[in-house]
Amino acid sequence: MTRFEGLVPATITPMTEAGEVYEEGFRRVLDLNIDAGVHGFWVAGGTGESVLLDDEENRHLACIAAEQVSGRGIVIMHVGAPTTARAAALAEHAAGAGVDAICCVPPFFYRRTDDEIVEHYRVVASAADLPLFVYNLPGMTGVEITVDLMRRIQDVVPQLIGLKHSSSIFANVHEFARMGLQCFIGSSALMLPALSVGAVGCVDGPPLMAPEVWM
């Protein structure tokens, strides 16, 4: 079974002056970080400016990352979108591209009920036979994935394996760990205290720029 832990940098999305994904540059960033010893990558999340990417660009990044990393680390692909249908379609593609897991923010912009958020994750997870990480990013989505809401998701989504916790409620790291979830802290500044209360690693942007320092 794939181990999801350690330092997993959140990738940037290099673009050309023409506004296209800079494939060569992206591959170089991945290789430089692998050579430094990182454990994997969180692709097309907040650091990768996912909300500015169209679906074809997301799919392209999934294919590049899966091909370039090629078992030298884990690839967790973000498939979040404002609608469940779009997120599920991206999840299905990511699975076909060969990534190791998917991650997903809750649906955003229009506020959903907790029931709708749970259903969102059930549908997205069902579209891809892959482990799922919830992406708790309340500062951007306006949705806090509470411990109670996470329990509800866990009850109906067997593929749920963990989350990236980018929330100010630090105490929930311990609670999520007690639930058996693999919790990545979303702030490299909090990596050591998070590891001490049960986090399995860190997903953040700064380590991508200087992986040797963080390793």
Language model segments and positions:
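Active-site beta->alpha loop and helix N-cap motifs at the rims of alpha/beta catalytic domains
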Residues: T2-G142, R152-Q154
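Catalytic alpha/beta core domains of metabolic enzymes, predominantly
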Residues: S126-A127, P138-M215
